[in-house]
Amino acid sequence: MDAVAAEPVVAPVLPLPAQVRDLGMQDYVPVWRAMQRFTDTRDEHTGDELWVVEHAPVFTLGQAGKPEHVLAPGEIPVLQVDRGGQVTYHGPGQLVVYPLLDLRRLRIGVRDYVCKIEQALIDTLGEWNIIAERRDGAPGVYVGGAKIAALGIRVRRGCTFHGLSFNVAMDLEPFHRINPCGYQGLQVTSVLDLGGPSGMDAVKAVLLDQLARQFGLVLQPTSALPDLSLPA
């Protein structure tokens, strides 16, 4: 009888721990530099983390960003950064989450990673009966044609940084000073404008739960903050 090759044994993917760090309100650059350092120095033993933050007002241009999409920034600073995507705005009342995940350990590719983030946002909005959708070729989440969440990611050595921004209860006027995500005339909206809660904590709790469900994570909140100091 011919020998039958044994099927390779694949260990089950168990829920993986991930620390959650709530950074509160922070300027953009110190957080950006900190997640770069975290990603550059991590190895296969480094645990995954989710950083949650609100940023002081800033426009960021991704690697594909074109300066002509910044129409009239006024007093708001404009930064060229190393994420994917075009131009977007960050400001108070917007929930920003930076997943610092090892995709190899999670056994997913970049496309699945993006889809899971979008689905977590869609399911979060569903908690308040807000029907949202994704668009082919235009990462992010939309409600009735208006963008409510933007994605801008970077993957280095299989590990993610940068992430998502979710308009909860914010002044949307600065979006009129740019072509959001490079699309002229793209409308934006917020959770509050669509009848959802104004409280950041309520939205934050639901979104973190949905991200944990999508990625198979056990969240471990910690009060310790990353080193946000800037090199001299």
UniProtKB/Swiss-Prot annotation:
It is found in: Cytoplasm. Keywords: Acyltransferase, Cytoplasm, Transferase. GO terms for biological process: protein modification process. Coiled coil: none annotated. The keyword Hydrolase does not apply. It catalyses: octanoyl-[ACP] + L-lysyl-[protein] = N(6)-octanoyl-L-lysyl-[protein] + holo-[ACP] + H(+). Residues 44-219 form the BPL/LPL catalytic domain. CDD domains: LipB (cd16444). It comes from the Bacteria. It holds the Pfam family LplA-B_cat. GO terms for molecular function: lipoyl(octanoyl) transferase activity. Signal peptide: none annotated. The record marks 147 as: Lowers pKa of active site Cys. The keyword Cytoplasm applies. The active site is at residue 181. InterPro entries: aa-tRNA-synth_II/BPL/LPL, BPL_LPL_catalytic, Octanoyltransferase, Octanoyltransferase_CS. Its EC number is 2.3.1.181. HAMAP family: LipB. Catalyzes the transfer of endogenously produced octanoic acid from octanoyl-acyl-carrier-protein onto the lipoyl domains of lipoate-dependent enzymes. Lipoyl-ACP can also act as a substrate although octanoyl-ACP is likely to be the physiological substrate. In the reaction, the free carboxyl group of octanoic acid is attached via an amide linkage to the epsilon-amino group of a specific lysine residue of lipoyl domains of lipoate-dependent enzymes. Belongs to the LipB family. This is Octanoyltransferase. It comes from Xanthomonas campestris pv. campestris (strain B100).
